[in-house]
């Protein structure tokens, strides 16, 4: 699918296919360094060998069933204006919103439990309509015509999901006149009195006319376009909604002109906000627009929907941002008498927090393509909040502003903000949430993405600033902060590893490998990244650990010494990734290894059983011949072992893995396996460097 390089690591992304047919969400990423595979992660589906890949229905027949299911009065491709605008946007005379079905292998959930699943050959359609406003992905069984799934395509700022059907139309751009968008004389710098951020410099477009400046910035990529949705009164059609470009006569967008009952100054925030977000990703991450191809970004401000008030979303079908807000002082909005749209809790939805968050969804979708299942959806929202922090930090540094970088939506919700990244459980925000994976306030019932996303954004805060304490699973942590500038690079690079069905454990793995690629695998940045994930309780992707699940064991490793390695620790809650530590040993040499553990009183008493493996042949697995320690401490309170180990002359040189495992069991129970997890005890993983002897 694509290849990319992060630091010294190469990333090759592959799409699973069955007999040439794409398997939905079957994405795999292979990470390598100097032609040696370091990591493979993704989703691989075991499609039955006898699966029939020949459809009975044609694409047009499947589309007919899809449209019958949607039942819209007018679809987006039936709008001449929308089709013309798309052709201009894509610079392609053949571009169209008319849905094209893709035949694919789809894993279909049977029943509401989602536990029983089967594979179906299905057509996938992206459907957008104007009346009613809908934007959905629909999966149709290619044999029976059954609608397997119909999912909302958009990513919302708050709430959202399948209960909110909205997709607005966008009329065509105004006439460019004698001036083309890419000509510098048409591009001007204006002064804008924004609603939330003070007076700011914005880039506008003259259209080749005098006294004519539009909110169109063609100095950044293929353009940033900002429209205002206005209530238009027509003697024949009555009042209807239309989006129009706002024109200023002197490029001085003043508070006197635009701070009115319809909040026209909010358009200036959206326009400036996307400009700053574009600049952030270009300067910090070397990324051009949301898709890396410098594509046009379109703002639709004050879009109205009677089903939902006060929100914003990124629409992946139209690739535009919509800000749903009916200005509370507008006579038209008041006349509608709908409490949902006149909720005094909210200010306008074009603050920099919201703008950067929604733009971030476009980036998340392009790189990882998260589904909106519970954990992928939470990651999508969490990464967008991370970009919100990054953009606010960027304008604070570049423009000397004082944005509150750790509070999401504090300008849109002046009473305390929507979410707190630094203190997710804060009772002063609109939506408190968890600071620990499956901890207090984790939403297990509804799996609300914005709520559970706070675990990811709080990981980012913890990594950036550092933090010490005890999480909701009673696990102690002490994280050294590495600053926002390093943390945001790790977060961005992690998206190259992730895939549509990624969960929190995958995000942990991706971030750790990103830190290794960017700062070196034995760096302090890697240690902090690991410690931050431990702090928020996201478990490592390991085959062996103590304290199964979220259970904190009462028996744990306290000391490991080998060669130049000495590590003392407390209770690490069953598993500790110490791969940033790497004792150095010499082939053929013998070393004294010291191992200590602690435990509690137990009836019957426990025996601390120890095993240590070193992957001498570097094949990625621990074999029985690679076990270098096996012994027990016959004291329930623990103690210390000293063992002599020899590094074989046949060992391969270079960096490899070492696993230290202590299992607390009753006397007579068997020793643990290298890939075994257990209730009481702990596993620690290390790197180890094997060298040849030299004088």
Each language-model region and where it sits:
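Segments that shape or occlude catalytic/ligand-binding pockets
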Residues: 1-166, 293-316, 695
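Solvent-exposed, polar/charged alpha-helical surfaces in well-ordered, non-transmembrane soluble domains
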Residues: 38-39, 60-64, 68, 275, ...
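Residue-level detector of high-confidence beta-strand sites
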Residues: 40, 150, 365, 625-627, ...
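Extracellular zinc-dependent metalloprotease catalytic-domain scaffold
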Residues: 97-135, 142-455, 462, 471, ...
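Pan-zinc metallopeptidase signature
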Residues: 434-526
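Beta/coil-rich, acidic/histidine-enriched accessory regions frequently appended to metallopeptidases
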Residues: 506-547, 695
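A broad "non-catalytic interaction surface" signal
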Residues: 540-695
């Amino acid at each position: 699918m694509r290849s990319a390089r992060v630091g010294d690591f190469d990333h090759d992304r592959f799409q699973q296919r069955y007999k040439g047919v794409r398997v939905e969400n079957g994405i795999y990423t292979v990470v390598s360094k100097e032609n040696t595979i370091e990591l493979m992660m993704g989703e691989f589906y075991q499609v039955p060998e006898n699966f029939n890949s020949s459809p009975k229905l044609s694409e047009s027949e499947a589309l007919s069933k899809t449209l019958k299911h949607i039942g819209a009065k007018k679809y987006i491709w039936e709008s001449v204006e929308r089709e013309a605008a798309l052709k201009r946007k894509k610079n392609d005379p053949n571009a169209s919103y008319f849905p094209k079905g893709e035949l694919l292998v789809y894993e279909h959930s049977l029943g509401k439990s989602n536990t029983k699943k089967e594979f179906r050959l299905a057509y996938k359609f992206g459907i957008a309509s104007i009346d009613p406003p809908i934007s959905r992905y629909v999966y149709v069984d290619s044999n029976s015509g059954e609608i397997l799934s119909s999912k909302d395509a958009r990513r919302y700022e708050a709430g959202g999901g399948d209960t909110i059907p909205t997709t607005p139309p966008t009329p065509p751009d105004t006439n460019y006149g004698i001036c083309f968008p890419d000509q510098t004389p048409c591009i001007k710098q204006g002064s804008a009195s924004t609603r939330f951020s003070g007076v700011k410099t914005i880039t506008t477009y003259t259209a080749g006319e005098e006294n004519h400046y539009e909110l169109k910035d063609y100095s950044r990529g293929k353009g940033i376009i900002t429209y205002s949705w206005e209530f238009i009164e027509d003697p024949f059609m009555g009042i209807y909604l239309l989006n129009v470009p706002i024109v200023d006569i002197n490029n001085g967008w003043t508070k006197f002109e635009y701070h009115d009952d319809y909040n026209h100054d909010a358009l200036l925030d959206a326009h400036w906000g996307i400009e700053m977000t574009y600049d952030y990703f270009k300067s910090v991450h070397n990324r051009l627009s949301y898709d890396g191809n410098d594509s046009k970004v379109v703002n639709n401000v004050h879009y109205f929907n009677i089903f939902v008030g006060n929100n914003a979303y990124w629409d992946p079908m139209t690739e535009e941002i919509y800000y749903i807000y009916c200005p509370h002082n507008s006579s038209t909005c008041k006349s509608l008498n709908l409490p949902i749209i006149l909720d005094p809790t909210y200010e306008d939805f074009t603050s920099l927090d919201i703008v950067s968050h929604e733009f971030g969804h476009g980036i998340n979708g392009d790189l990882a393509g998260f589904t909106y299942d519970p954990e992928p959806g939470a990651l999508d929202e969490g990464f967008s909040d991370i970009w919100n922090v990054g953009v606010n930090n960027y304008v604070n540094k570049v423009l000397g502003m004082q944005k509150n970088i750790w509070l999401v939506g504090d300008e849109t919700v002046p009473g305390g903000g929507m979410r707190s990244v630094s203190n997710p459980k804060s009772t002063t925000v609109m939506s408190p949430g968890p600071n620990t994976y499956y901890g207090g306030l984790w939403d297990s019932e509804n799996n609300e993405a914005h709520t559970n996303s706070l675990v990811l954004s709080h990981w980012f805060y913890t990594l950036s600033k550092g933090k010490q304490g005890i999480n909701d699973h009673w696990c102690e942590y002490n994280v050294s902060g590495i600053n926002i500038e390093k943390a945001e690079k790790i977060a961005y690079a992690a998206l190259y590893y992730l895939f549509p069905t990624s969960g929190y454990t995958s995000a942990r793995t991706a971030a750790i490998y990103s830190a290794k690629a960017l700062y070196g695998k034995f760096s302090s940045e890697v240690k902090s990244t690991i410690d931050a994930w431990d702090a928020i309780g996201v478990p490592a992707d390991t085959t062996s650990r103590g304290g199964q699940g979220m259970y904190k064991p009462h028996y744990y490793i306290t000391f490991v010494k080998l060669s130049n390695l000495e590590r003392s620790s407390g209770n690490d809650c069953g598993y500790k990734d110490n791969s940033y530590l790497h004792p150095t040993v010499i082939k053929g040499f013998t070393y004294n290894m010291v191992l200590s553990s602690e435990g509690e009183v137990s009836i019957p008493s426990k025996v601390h059983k120890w095993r240590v493996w070193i992957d001498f042949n570097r094949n990625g697995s621990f074999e029985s011949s690679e076990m270098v320690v096996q012994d027990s401490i016959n004291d329930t309170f623990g103690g210390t072992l000293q063992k002599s180990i020899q590094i074989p002359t046949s060992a391969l040189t270079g960096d490899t893995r070492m696993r230290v495992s202590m299992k607390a069991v009753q006397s007579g129970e068997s020793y643990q396996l290298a890939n075994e997890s257990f209730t009481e005890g702990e596993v620690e993983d290390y790197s180890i460097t094997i060298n040849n002897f030299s004088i």
